[in-house]
């Protein structure tokens, strides 16, 4: 039997997280928050919590897309930025990741080392996550903001993130909330249903799916982790 996780009180959770974010920003003597909006539920909730904590004028949303980013995700990132009414920019990371491939001469290297395609795919996917982290910190430095992480408890517990990529941040406000609990909170906090219900994916390569990679649905995973 799959265990259903207890529902979190959305009002109490919001107050607690808002206090945590405000204290962290104030301790850092920072002026605001940069959030990478991917168009998914985790970053949408993180953006919402940032705005609730600091006001929309102190939050910058950035969507960093590549050729493998699903069009729907770009649409949802824009939708979220509009709903939150925050400053928002879109940056393509394709040129930067292509430059990396040229510099590392990946094609010749593969013939030398016999690296299989899957390994290359994962290395390139992780590279994209790390490029995104670098861009978030670049904008954070320019504005004296901190970078908000978007990792949930389910992913953090099993290590389903890129070290120094999406794992590179100053604060993880949803890091204590399991994915299935987050879906219910997102509903209460007014995150659009389209964003909540679409299959979770990182868009690091074509047709990527979180649950395929993990090998379990988040319902099963959370029931095991909890």
Task: Describe the residue ranges of each PLM region.
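ATP-dependent adenylation/nucleotidyltransferase module used to activate substrates
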Residues: 1-157
